[in-house]
A protein has these predicted regions:
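Nucleotide-activated donor-binding/catalytic signature segment of Leloir-type glycosyltransferases, i.e.
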Residues: 267-268, 276-279, 285-286, 291-318
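Nucleotide-sugar-dependent
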Residues: 246, 310-320, 327-349, 353-354
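N-terminal subdomain of nucleotide-sugar transferases
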Residues: 1-66, 253, 258
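An aromatic- and histidine-rich active-site surface loop
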Residues: 86, 90-102, 109-133, 137-140, ...
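Membrane-proximal helix-turn-helix segments that form the acceptor-binding/catalytic region
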Residues: 119, 126-130, 156-178
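A short helix/loop element that forms part of the nucleotide-sugar donor recognition site in Leloir-type
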Residues: 56-60, 212-229
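Carbohydrate-associated surface elements
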Residues: 44, 182, 202-205
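Conserved donor-binding/catalytic core segment of Leloir-type glycosyltransferases
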Residues: 223, 230-246, 252-256
Length: 354
């Protein structure tokens, strides 16, 4: 067998961070090792905004995880609800990743994702030029379309420049990957079906050996329920990023109709009950830019049957997902064709209704 081809992956987040794209890229990177020499460039573990002291002293950290070479870029801590701190964090990764790529040596391929928005694509383009390599651009979310859909920015000039920049990244790619059929249509619409870049569709996934259905009496599932007060409850769960793109603020306002003390046929003073007598509770597992708003709203309106649980380690994801009786998989209005909710794969993995 000849020498392996080399591929450089700009991941933004990577294991052990709990970001869904980081977990997917870990699976991908490790799955490519038989045929490729794989190097990943990412931030130091910091998805929650805080950083361990051991990752605060050097500019770059060189590691290896399960055969994958990793160059971690030091970035400043941030607060997900603070735009300025997030921008500083993202720019630190962008410029740090460019510097890290020079330390990655010769590469045959550069693989990048659409995160951070726009800049992820530009990392791929600049990495391609720097390495004289072929570029693969995996679009998990289309921007500025996503930014427009949630009203994050209404500055027409900024949005126009974002579109020009990301279309440039698409055109410079040797292959564009989208993660859903609707995203393919969005790509076609961007270019009005003319001079389309070469593209293919590859869905995201879940490892069915790691996330699968468990019986209700599984000890670890019961331990999770006990830890968070979910015993003998009917659990309606949202698990994932509690961010802008899911309209969770409106969802929580609807839950006002189901709080304890609300009386309606089939809904008792203790709160809504199932036919077998279990109290219905609404559980949000994760973190994100709107989490604090949701917590404040539920406290203000005395929601006693809404529970917030921190992100779970990937090893524990199987237990938290199995603890839900029904799962929400929601997107904000306008997100169709712009983003594909990868959380659906975990829900299907444990065999729960959506």
């Amino acid at each position: 067998m000849g020498e392996k081809k080399k591929i450089l992956i700009f991941a933004h987040y990577y294991a052990p961070d709990t970001a869904s794209t980081g977990q997917i890229l870990k699976d991908q990177a490790e799955g490519m090792l038989e045929e490729f020499d794989v190097t990943v460039i990412c931030v130091v573990p910091s998805y929650g905004g805080t950083i361990e002291d051991r990752y605060k002293t050097k500019k770059y950290y060189f590691e290896e995880l399960n055969g994958v070479k990793i160059i971690r870029v030091r970035v400043p801590e941030f607060t997900k609800s603070n735009k300025i701190s997030r921008v500083k964090n993202i720019l630190a990764y962008f410029f740090g990743a460019l510097g890290a790529s020079r330390k990655a040596g010769k590469q045959d391929y550069v693989f990048t994702i659409s995160q951070p928005p726009i800049l992820g694509g530009w990392l791929g383009v600049l990495g391609k030029w720097q390495k004289h390599a072929k570029m693969i651009y995996c679009i998990q979310d289309f921007n500025p379309e996503q930014t427009i859909a949630v009203g994050y920015s209404k500055n027409r000039l900024v949005l126009k420049l974002m579109m020009i920049a990301d279309k440039f990244s698409c055109r410079r790619s040797n292959l564009v990957i989208t993660v859903g059929r609707d995203l393919v249509e969005t790509l076609k619409n961007r270019f009005k079906n003319k001079n389309l870049p070469k593209y293919t569709m590859i869905n995201n996934w879940i490892d069915e050996k790691e996330v699968y259905p468990l019986p209700e009496d599984n000890e670890d599932v019961l331990a999770f329920k006990k830890k968070y007060g979910l015993e003998n409850k009917f659990v309606i769960m949202y698990s994932g990023n509690i961010g802008l793109y899911y309209d969770l603020e409106k969802l929580v306002k609807v839950l006002k109709q189901f709080r304890k003390g609300y009386t309606l046929k089939g809904v008792y003073e203790s709160g809504p009950l199932t036919t077998d007598g279990r109290e219905v509770v609404f559980v949000f597992v994760g973190a994100g830019s709107v989490l604090d708003k949701l917590v404040m709203y539920t406290k203000k309106h005395h929601f006693e049957n809404v529970i917030f649980i921190p992100y779970q380690d990937k090893a524990d994801l199987i237990y938290s997902l199995n603890a839900g009786d029904v799962h929400w998989c929601v997107n904000a209005k306008g997100i169709k064709g712009v983003s594909c909710p990868s959380k659906v794969y975990g829900i299907m993995g444990v065999g729960k209704p959506i």
